[in-house]
Structure formats: structure tokens, C-alpha cells
Regions:
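Conserved oxyanion/phosphate-binding beta-strand-loop segments in alpha/beta enzyme cores
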Residues: 3, 7-58, 87-96, 119-129, ...
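Helix-rich, typically C-terminal accessory recognition domains appended to large enzymatic cores
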Residues: 100, 165-166, 170-177, 247, ...
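Intrinsic disorder/low-complexity segments
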Residues: 1-9, 256-308, 512-523, 726-738
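Glycine- and acidic
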Residues: 7-13, 60-68, 110, 140-145, ...
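Alpha-helical recognition segments enriched in aromatics with Gly/Pro capping
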Residues: 376-382, 386-399, 553, 559-695
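Residue patterns forming the tRNA-binding/recognition surfaces of aminoacyl-tRNA synthetases
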Residues: 2-6, 16, 24-25, 29-37, ...
């Protein structure tokens, strides 16, 4: 490890601050010292007595687009400042970097530039790595990972096989999100308002495809419950994930489709209980018995094969108020009706088109509600009542069961639909069973405080009590099941692209009928490859076109293979994995990046995990951040790790904007970090990114601000180099005199106030902007006392303490300048491996305090007292003030209120 003081540089008083000379010099030295940023080995550290506390600091790995942008600079400057501070406070720090290197842009570049994706990607990585080095970022490049290389993606394939063994990876035909511009499938999380997450102007289409899925829903409850313990994650992220998981408790209930001409056996019962439609809307009248009227469900001839409609409801307690059943236009029962009804078929086709347009516009929730009566009826299993079946354009086939029971009196959406089409609105929930219905506005939800009316044997019960009882009743009757549903769907990971991880499955042409002793094989000859066959390597000679389907399917040498079970001919899977697979576990690989026998060594991962501080954008809340939580739980269940969550703390930084908008090439407001570094230096560029705004807020980029920070650093350089020789001569550890001069006391007070402020801000507050502001105040305090220093009023020990501390305080934010000044002052060792200054509370205490004095609550004057004065001293100072004496002359002070260190208030008459 480099010892900066051994370079022997002499102070350079009189020279101007030149980052163009300083920064390349230090980066060359740091590059030559390959172990400079290396963490101590987990096995060595964990066994030592009094071992350093570990600190895993990680910024989200970037996609290698070829150029860093200012958002990257801000993200990495935050992590770098934290990592350097943790080194200086005695931690064993892991601070790695890698590349999320698979993805569509490489294929687009291949089309545009006729450059192979691998060549384009690796070239971009080299360019961005060079930029990161130029920024002076403290990454341990020995742990670097690149997800598009076989030594990484073979473990994606290994995990896929392990999930397949456990039933967590499976294949099915389903309706998927299709981006016509990407020519591939998108996961639900990658559809933003009906548009592709990559192409914000491209509407997403719905297609039926056979895809591979990962069973993330098996972990839905744990993913949701875990959010309550993740106090180190932003509330916004936790809320977004909870909403995305979307847990709903309720029941599945079966409504049998009535055969044509079937009588309504509940009509007489309703007539006995109510006379006329007007009475039906009343409250408080008890209904008759609720014995479920069950009918044979195998009478397919009379039933036209329509069978049963299953609905999911969170309010089974309102089922006596169901006045229709509504189907999505793509529901199988709706399609069955349409086979013999051309009018209905036309309506369904039109509704599907409406839904498609609404999805494309990202406004499926705002679609104008439209429905059509089928002329058919469903039977309410709780009372045998026949209710009309409608097809409605706002019911979605892929949400819930694609069917609802409509209870317009107690659901806003149902109320709107029923009002439009004149459907019956029947009240079955009231605020109080004895309360007059006058003034009750519909729809009325009443789940928390409502009671049931006109609901058979459950009349008079609270809604919450009835929900549990009625769900159990449905289960006992064989027409329902209490259940929990989720908005979260299984993760579709198949992508019809080339530049991704090959899926390690083959399709045997023999289908394996009668193969003895072979592994379990799905119908149709789906066979997992053995681990010995990994990695399945991407072929390099692939024609990238804009045609649909996977490019790998056009490479016979890749597609045609042999079955690992029977040795017969087989075809490889030609889809590749979603690139979010790569980023779901990458941070574990950093702990053991060169392991060729396993994804990582469990002991090393268990030492470093969970990540102590993870840093990245909030836009990843329901993509990367939820997938990585799922992957962590799977790895735990595989016995690879002990932790259940990947990161203890998450910080989501704000965006960098310019001219009021996020930087983008299309807006012409992109600022190049290279240009800023060339003009102002890396220290000024990254320090401005930390200073201009609190890190969790958006930052409005102003080049004048970078210039201002550069001028500040020049002032630091001037004042430190002026006294560097004196500091070098003073050495370290010489005791201060017992009595300090006024100049010494003043500058030490500001110094230790600054140290205390920075220590507080690094303890989780993340107020780097105020850290830097405090350093600026300290520098101003030193410069203000430059004359006193020149006059010898500041002793050598104090001078050494002040200037060495200043440079150490600066080190996390401006590492190049700190290293240069540390060397010039003769500092020992590496500046950011030197212990960070500790605050001295006595020295930080103000010498004097200004105390407002009030008379009858109105400010009269301000008096100065020694810091720490007691009540009597404060009272004496107030009473001795000339303005106070003039105001109270001839009056009586009836009460004196003293707030120690804050205020004196005299009450006079």
C-alpha cells in the first residue's frame, strides 16, 4: 500500500491549484497500488479478537452504455464519500463495482453499427472504467464482475436449474406483454403506464406465448411481511413494493351458470320477505333462511357447457346485494356465449379493442365503462337467486379471475355501472341495523363499522365478523374457498433476444416415452441440462435482425443438440433470460468474484451480508429491488446464505436535472462529466454533486456552481501550501499549551464544531451538503486568522492539528487534493486510511452566548454572557443592561423567566 509521505514531496507555496496536474499524478499512483482499496479477507478478519467492523458499501451497478452521465457521478460520489469515511473510522470496507452488461442496447448497436454485441459492450466497459478511475473512485477492481461473460452467467444458469428442481421455474402458455420495438416480452414490472420501460413512446401489446416463469408468488407473503422489518429502507420504496405485491384477503365463490329457461327458485322467498322493488331497497328487514340452493353442475346439455363462473371478492359479506355477475370480454364463459350469438361476438371484439387502446394509452383504469347483457343468468349460491350475466369492458381477464359479482350499493365502480344501465341497487350493509335509512348515501362501504341487513342468517352481524363466517359457509357448501390473492404475478423471464443468458433447457424430439431411470421430464420432452454442461455459451456468429423471434433460433449450430437423458436429437431453448436475473444476485458474487466452483463461498457471503448501505435510484423499487429480495430468499432456502434480505439500509438519491428537466440527449441538456473534469477537475465535479443539494433531493445542475467549488478548492490549496512547511516541521502529537491564545481558541472551536457536524451527518443523516458547507466555514475561519498565524499567535501544535484535520475532513469529498496536501504536509501513510478526526466537546463549546432579553414578551435587547452561564448570571447580565434599566425604571419586576442558554423574560408592572 502506498505511503504518501515517502514520496518526499516538498511544499509548493506560491503555485496555483492545478487539478490537471494533481489528479493524474495521484490516479497513476493509486492504479499502481492494486491492493489500495482491497478489503481484508473475510476469513482473516472474522477470527481476530477486536476485529474491525465490516462495512459493505455498494452503488447499483451500471449498464455499460459507453459514457457516464451526471446521475452516475452523483450516485458514485455518495458511495465513494461514505466508503472513504468508513475506512478512516476503522472499518473493513468492501466497495466493489461491476457491469450489468446484457441487454437490448447492444443488439440495437449491432444493427446500427454492424458491431457484435460483445465487442460493443466490452469496449463501453473499458471506456466507463477509465472514466471511473479518472473520477478517483475507490473501487476494488479485483472484485469486478461483468454479467455478459460466461464466468458470471453460468451461475445464472445454475440457479435456474436449482429453481427448476424445486418447482420454482416452470413453463406455460400465457398472455404476455410484448414490446413491438424491442421485439420481446416484458415483465409486468417493465410496463409503465401501458408503455415499454425502455421506449416510453411505444405502447405494449398483449400476446399469447409459451414462456418460462419464476414462481416469485411463492414468496409473496414473506416479501410483504419482510417490509415491516426493513427500517433502513425508505418508506416510499416499502410502500411501492407493498402496493405491487397487493395482498388481498377474501374468498373465491362459484356462481353456476343457469341453463336457459331455468326458473328462479329464490323469487318466492324474496316475495315473502319483500313486497315490491321499493321495499327491496329498504334497511332493517330480516331475510328468510339462507340455506344454499345447490344444483347439479354436470348438466352440460341444459347448461350449454357454460359451467361455473368463479369470482374473487374481498367482501363476501355483501353477496346478498349482488345484482349481476360481470365478465371480462376474454373470459371463457363469455366466449362460449359468443359462439352462438353473433351480436355478442361483435360486442366482445369491440370491447377487446377498447381495452387494447386503453392499455396502449396507459389509461386502462380510466376507460369509459361499457357493458352488454348476455341474456343469461348465474345462480347466487347463497340464496339461489338468478342474477343477470353481463360482459363489461372494464373487467380485465388477467386480473383476479376475470369475473366479478357486482354489488352496486356498496362499491363505487359497480354503482356507476348499475346507474348507467338501470340495474338493481340492493342495500345489504347499513351503519346500524336499527338506524333509519334516511340520508344514507350510496355507495356505502361500511366494512369497518357496518352491519348486514337483508342477508339471511347473517343479518345483524358486523361486516368483519360475517366475512369470516360466510367464507367458511361457502367452503362447507362446496361452492367457495377462503383465500388470499396477490397483485404480484409470477416473473416471466423468457426474452426473445440474443444478448442475454441462454436458458439451460432442451426439448427432446423423442419425448422420453418409456425412458427408464431418467430424471423427471415434463410432457413434450422438456429436459434440464446437467450442471456439467454449464455454461451454455452464447454463439458469437449471430445475425441480429429486426425480425420477430429469438435470434438464437436462426443459429443451427446452437439449436441442434443431443438430449442429455437419451442421447437422441434435441433442440435448445432459444429464448434468453430477462436481464434482471443478472442483477438479482450480483452483489453476492462480489464477495468471491473469481470462484469457478460455486457462485460464491457461503462463509464469505455470510461475513459481508447484508449490505450495510445500498445506493441507487427509486425507479428500481419494483424491478431490481423486489427481484433481488426474492432471489436472496431462494438462495437462503438453497442453504447458500443465512440472511433473508440483501441490504440493511437503502438510500435512493435524487435525479440530476438541467433546465428543469431530467438530462437526456433528446432534450439537449446533457452535461458530460469528462468536460467538467477537464475544465474544473474531478474533485470539484464530484464535490459539487454532493454540495448543491441534499442527496435525496433532485439536483439542478449549474456549471457556475462547479466553478465556485473549484475556486473554494483553490483557496484550500493556497492556505494549506502556505503553511505546509510549518506543519511538516511541527510533526504530530506535540501537546498544546495549557492556555490558548484567542486566535487558537477561535480556530480550534470552529474546527471541532466542524468535526462534530460531519460525524453526525455521516451517521445516517446523509447531509453531505452541510458537511461541505461546514468545511467551507472552517476554511474561512482559518483565512480570517491568517494575520494572527503570521504574527505567531498560533502555536506549531495547534497549527498542525488544524491543517492536518482540515485535510482529513476533506478527504472523503476531494480525495485527489487531500492526498496532495497530505503529502506536502508530511502526513504519514495514505490519507484516507488515516484515522478521521474526533470532536472535542470542550474545545467546540462557544466562548460566549448571545441571550435575547424580553420585557413582557417583547424583545428589548440582546446581552452577551460567557457560554454555560447559569440562571443567576444570565439574570444579572439582563438586569445590568442600560436598555433594560431604562424600560423598568419606576416599575416593579414581578417575575423573571430564565431559559438557560436561550432567553430572559422580565414580567413588569
Amino acid at each position: 500500500m502506498t505511503n504518501e509521505s515517502e514520496r518526499g514531496a516538498e511544499p509548493t507555496q506560491g503555485q496555483r491549484y492545478s487539478p490537471a496536474e494533481i489528479e493524474p499524478k495521484w490516479q497513476a499512483r493509486w492504479d499502481a497500488d492494486t491492493g489500495l482499496y482491497a478489503a481484508e479477507a473475510a476469513g482473516d478478519v472474522s477470527q481476530k479478537d477486536g476485529a474491525k467492523a465490516k462495512f459493505y458499501c455498494l452503488e447499483m451497478l451500471p449498464y455499460p452504455s459507453g459514457q457516464l452521465h451526471m446521475g452516475h457521478v452523483r450516485n458514485y460520489a455518495i458511495g465513494d464519500a461514505l466508503a472513504r469515511y468508513m475506512w478512516m473510522t476503522g472499518h473493513n470496507v468492501l466497495h466493489p463495482m461491476g457491469w450489468d452488461a446484457f441487454g437490448l442496447p447492444a443488439e440495437n448497436a449491432a444493427l446500427k453499427n454492424n458491431t457484435p454485441p460483445r465487442e460493443w459492450t466490452l469496449g463501453n466497459i473499458a471506456a466507463m472504467r477509465k472514466q471511473m478511475r479518472r473520477m478517483g473512485l475507490s473501487y476494488d477492481w479485483a472484485t469486478e464482475i461483468t454479467t455478459c461473460l460466461p464466468d458470471y452467467y453460468r451461475w445464472n444458469q445454475w440457479f435456474f436449474l436449482k429453481m427448476y428442481e424445486r418447482g420454482l421455474a416452470y413453463r406455460k402458455k400465457s398472455k404476455v406483454n410484448w414490446c413491438p420495438q424491442c421485439q420481446t416480452v416484458l415483465a409486468n414490472e417493465q410496463v409503465i403506464g401501458g408503455y415499454c420501460w425502455r421506449h416510453e413512446d411505444t405502447p405494449v401489446e398483449q400476446r399469447d406465448l409459451t414462456q418460462w416463469f419464476l414462481r416469485i408468488t411463492q414468496y409473496a407473503d414473506e416479501l410483504l411481511d419482510g417490509l415491516t422489518t426493513m427500517e433502513g429502507w425508505p418508506e416510499k420504496v416499502r410502500t411501492m413494493q407493498a402496493n405491487w405485491i397487493g395482498r388481498s384477503e377474501g374468498a373465491f365463490v362459484e356462481f353456476r351458470v343457469a341453463w336457459e329457461g331455468e326458473a328462479d327458485p329464490s323469487a318466492a322467498l324474496r316475495d315473502d320477505n319483500k313486497k315490491g322493488d321499493d321495499d327491496r331497497e329498504g334497511l332493517g328487514r330480516e331475510a328468510g333462511p339462507s340455506t344454499p340452493l345447490r344444483f347439479a353442475q354436470d348438466d352440460n346439455q341444459k347448461n350449454n357447457g357454460a359451467g361455473v363462473i368463479t369470482v374473487f371478492t374481498t367482501r363476501v359479506d355483501t353477496i346478498f346485494g349482488a345484482t349481476s355477475v360481470q365478465l371480462a370480454p376474454e373470459h371463457p364463459v363469455a366466449k362460449g356465449f359468443a359462439e352462438t350469438d353473433e351480436r355478442l361476438a361483435g360486442e366482445i371484439e369491440e370491447m377487446i379493442a377498447q381495452q387494447t387502446l386503453a392499455r396502449e394509452a396507459g389509461d386502462i383504469g380510466g376507460i369509459e365503462k361499457h357493458g352488454v347483457a348476455t341474456g343469461r343468468f348465474a345462480v347466487n349460491p347463497f340464496n339461489g337467486e338468478r342474477v343477470p350475466i353481463w360482459i363489461a369492458n372494464y373487467i380485465l381477464a388477467d386480473y383476479g379471475t376475470g369475473a366479478i359479482m357486482s354489488v352496486p350499493a356498496h362499491d363505487e365502480r359497480d354503482f356507476e355501472f348499475a346507474t348507467k344501465y338501470g340495474l338493481e341497487i340492493r342495500r345489504v350493509v347499513a351503519p346500524n341495523v336499527d338506524e333509519d335509512e334516511a340520508g344514507l348515501r350510496l355507495p356505502y362501504m361500511g366494512e369497518d363499522e357496518g352491519v348486514l341487513v337483508d342477508s339471511g342468517e347473517w343479518t345483524g352481524e358486523s361486516c368483519l365478523e360475517a366475512q369470516e363466517k360466510m367464507a367458511a359457509f361457502a367452503k362447507a357448501g362446496g361452492f367457495g374457498t377462503p383465500t388470499v390473492t396477490y397483485r404480484l404475478k409470477d416473473w416471466g423471464v423468457s426474452r426473445q433476444r440474443y444478448w442475454g443468458t441462454p436458458i439451460p433447457m432442451v426439448y427432446c424430439e423423442r419425448g422420453h416415452a418409456g425412458v427408464a431411470g431418467g430424471p423427471d421430464v415434463e410432457a413434450g420432452g422438456v429436459v434440464p441440462l446437467p450442471e456439467s454442461a454449464l455454461p451454455v455459451i452464447l454463439p458469437e456468429q449471430v445475425e441480429i435482425t429486426q425480425e420477430g423471434g429469438s435470434p438464437l433460433g436462426r443459429v443451427p449450430e446452437f439449436v441442434n443438440t443431443t438430449c442429455p437423458v437419451c442421447g437422441g436429437p434435441a433442440r435448445r431453448e432459444t429464448d434468453t433470460m430477462d436481464t434482471f436475473v443478472d442483477s438479482s444476485w450480483y452483489f453476492y458474487r462480489y464477495t468471491d468474484a473469481k470462484n469457478d466452483r460455486a457462485p460464491f463461498d457461503s462463509a464469505k457471503a455470510n461475513y459481508w451480508f447484508p449490505i450495510d448501505q445500498y445506493i441507487g435510484g427509486v425507479e428500481h423499487a419494483i424491478l431490481h429491488l423486489i427481484y433481488s429480495r426474492f432471489w436472496t430468499k431462494v438462495m437462503r432456502d438453497l442453504g447458500l446464505i443465512e440472511n433473508s434480505e440483501p441490504a440493511e439500509r437503502l438510500f435512493t438519491q435524487g435525479m440530476v436535472i438541467k433546465d428543469g428537466a431530467k438530462m437526456s440527449k433528446s432534450k439537449g441538456n446533457v452535461v458530460s462529466p469528462d468536460d467538467m473534469i477537464a475544465q474544473y477537475g474531478a474533485d470539484a465535479t464530484r464535490m459539487y454533486a454532493l454540495f448543491a443539494a441534499p442527496p435525496d433531493r433532485d439536483l439542478e445542475w449549474q456549471e457556475d456552481g462547479v466553478a465556485g467549488v473549484s475556486r473554494f478548492l483553490a483557496r484550500v490549496y493556497r492556505i494549506v501550501t502556505k503553511y505546509a512547511r510549518a506543519v511538516r516541521s511541527a510533526g504530530i502529537g506535540e501537546a498544546r499549551a495549557a492556555t490558548l491564545s484567542a486566535a487558537e481558541g477561535d480556530v480550534l472551536r470552529v474546527l471541532h464544531q466542524t468535526v462534530a457536524k460531519i460525524e453526525l451527518d455521516f451517521s445516517g443523516r446523509w447531509h453531505f451538503n452541510t458537511c461541505i458547507s461546514s468545511i467551507m466555514i472552517l476554511v474561512n475561519a482559518i483565512i480570517d486568522r491568517e494575520g494572527a498565524i503570521d504574527a505567531g499567535e498560533v502555536s506549531a501544535p495547534v497549527l498542525s492539528e488544524v491543517f492536518r484535520s482540515l485535510v482529513l475532513l476533506l478527504a472523503p469529498f476531494a480525495p485527489f487534493l487531500a492526498a496532495e496536501l497530505w503529502e506536502q504536509m508530511g502526513g504519514e501513510g495514505v490519507v484516507f486510511r488515516t484515522p478521521f478526526p474526533r470532536p472535542d466537546a470542550e474545545l467546540a463549546r462557544e466562548a460566549e452566548a448571545e441571550i435575547p432579553v424580553q420585557i413582557n414578551g417583547k424583545l428589548v435587547t440582546v446581552v452577551t454572557v460567557p457560554a454555560g452561564s447559569d440562571e443567576e448570571a444570565m439574570k444579572a447580565a439582563a438586569m445590568g443592561d442600560e436598555k433594560v434599566q431604562a424600560r423598568i425604571a419606576g416599575k416593579t419586576v414581578v417575575k423573571t423567566i430564565v431559559v438557560t442558554g436561550k432567553l430572559v423574560n422580565l414580567v413588569v408592572r
